[in-house]
């Protein structure tokens, strides 16, 4: 069933047994721990342990600042460890070089030293942007991710890929730079709206399709509880997603092999985000639609088991995520999405790589997907 221009990857990662922490092995110098904790008290305790007396700055956004930042900064200030705190404007448009340079200017103003720590408290935009800033300032200073959205806890805050967007493409300017620790507080998820929860669930569905049939079954069986962000379902999900991503990233932490199954849904998803100018479509929504496109291409090629194709699309729909162009927040034209994909191909050395599902836990990395195939899929999914 494999595409002649691709290779097949099998995975069957079980749900983790340890629901307190995940240890991440990258290299000898880059290992770190992911803490998944039920409440703010334990999250702050974990942060203080990881800081080990070092001073820190807190960078968040103007929404999270009102919800969660006060407690973190107050605890640091009480111990004489707070250098300063600042907030960027919430939203994808802040994930830019302009914001990054403004933050670097601020770090210089507060005299952040090489041994000091940068704390990224927020969603995907914050952890991506702040991680990039930490990688660049003084050739790299330590940072701790405290992701506050589901998407950041299950994906963006883990793995050490830090970047900002560019008008030409999403995540065009970035680095591989691992955090000192990741501290996820499940209590923070209670403040999210349903759309943000759905966006985060898209990234977990991605991991389930490519690497964990057991997790896919779990999401199907617990979809309503997950949408309600109810325990214990959401707790299991965050732990499982972190464990699965770290295992996959650990095999190729610096993307020496760019053909990775974690990019399932992201080829078209990034094109949609670029076309809609990083505004009305959330990242998880774009990835969800990108997965549906990949499933459609795989079905047209006769690669994917039909039952699996139906289950994946049905689960995405059940979670309230887009399965058609018209269901996106801003409806891009087929021609515009194709044009963005062709630009991505130019940036990525001429190959339009698609991760195509074969069955749950098995994917083909295809490097020969044509413009015509993608256009036909987009037309079918219009």
Swiss-Prot record:
Gene3D superfamilies for this protein: 3.40.50.1970, Dehydroquinate synthase-like - alpha domain
UniProt entry keywords in alphabetical sequence: Cobalt, Lyase, Metal-binding, NAD, Nucleotide-binding, Zinc
GO CC list: cytoplasm
Cofactor note: Binds 1 divalent metal cation per subunit. Co(2+) is the preferred cofactor.
Gene Ontology MF terms: 3-dehydroquinate synthase activity; metal ion binding; nucleotide binding
Xref: InterPro entries: Dehydroquinate_synthase (IPR050071), DHQ_synth_AroB (IPR016037), DHQ_synth_fam (IPR030963), DHQS/DOIS_N (IPR030960), DHQS_C (IPR056179)
Disulphide bridges: none
Cofactor field: NAD(+); Co(2+); Zn(2+)
Chain positions recorded as NAD(+) binding sites: 92-95, 124-128, 148-149, 161, 170, 188-191
Pfam families: DHQ_synthase, DHQS_C
Top enzyme category: lyase
GO biological process: aromatic amino acid family biosynthetic process
Domain of life of the native organism: Bacteria
Keyword tRNA processing annotated: no
Residues noted as binding Zn(2+) in the record, renumbered to the chain: 203, 266, 283
Enzyme Commission number(s) from the entry: 4.2.3.155
Catalytic reaction annotation: D-sedoheptulose 7-phosphate = 2-epi-valiolone + phosphate
Keyword set includes Metal-binding: yes
Role of this protein: Catalyzes the conversion of sedoheptulose 7-phosphate to 2-epi-valiolone, which may serve as an alternative precursor for aminocyclitol biosynthesis.
Family: Belongs to the sugar phosphate cyclases superfamily. EVS family.
Protein name: 2-epi-valiolone synthase
């Amino acid at each position: 069933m494999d595409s002649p221009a691709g290779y097949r990857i099998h995975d069957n990662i079980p749900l983790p047994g340890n629901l307190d922490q995940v240890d991440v092995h990258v290299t000898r110098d880059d290992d770190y721990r992911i803490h998944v904790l039920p409440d703010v008290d334990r999250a702050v305790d974990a942060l203080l342990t990881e800081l080990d007396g070092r001073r820190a700055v807190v960078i968040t956004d103007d929404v999270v600042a009102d919800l969660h930042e006060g407690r973190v900064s107050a605890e640091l200030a009480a111990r004489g460890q707070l250098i300063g705190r600042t907030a960027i404007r919430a939203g994808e448009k802040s994930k830019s070089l302009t914001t990054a340079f403004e933050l670097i200017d601020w770090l210089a103003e507060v005299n952040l030293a090489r041994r000091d720590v940068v704390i990224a408290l927020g969603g995907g935009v914050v952890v991506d942007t702040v991680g990039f800033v930490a990688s660049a300032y003084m050739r790299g200073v330590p940072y701790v991710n405290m992701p506050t959205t589901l998407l950041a806890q299950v994906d963006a805050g883990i793995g050490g890929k830090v970047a900002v967007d560019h008008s030409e493409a999403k995540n065009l300017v970035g680095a591989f730079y691992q955090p000192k620790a990741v501290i996820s507080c499940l209590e923070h998820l209670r403040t999210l709206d349903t759309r943000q929860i759905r966006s985060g669930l898209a990234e977990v569905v991605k991991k389930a399709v490519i690497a964990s049939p057991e997790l896919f079954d779990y999401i199907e069986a617990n979809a309503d509880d997950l949408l309600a962000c109810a325990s214990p379902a959401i707790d299991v999900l965050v732990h499982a997603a972190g464990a699965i991503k770290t295992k996959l990233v650990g095999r190729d932490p610096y993307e020496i092999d760019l053909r990775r199954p974690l990019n399932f849904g992201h080829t078209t998803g990034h094109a949609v985000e670029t076309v809609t100018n990083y505004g009305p479509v959330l990242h998880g929504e774009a990835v969800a639609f990108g997965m549906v496109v990949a499933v459609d291409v795989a079905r047209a090629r006769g690669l994917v088991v039909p039952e699996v194709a139906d289950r994946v699309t049905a689960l995405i729909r059940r979670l309230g995520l887009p399965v058609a162009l018209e269901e996106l927040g801003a409806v891009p034209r087929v021609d515009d999405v194709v044009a963005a994909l062709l630009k991505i191909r130019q940036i990525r050395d001429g190959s339009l790589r698609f991760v195509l599902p074969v069955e749950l836990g098995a994917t083909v990395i295809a490097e020969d997907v044509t413009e015509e195939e993608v256009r036909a899929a987009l037309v079918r999914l219009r």
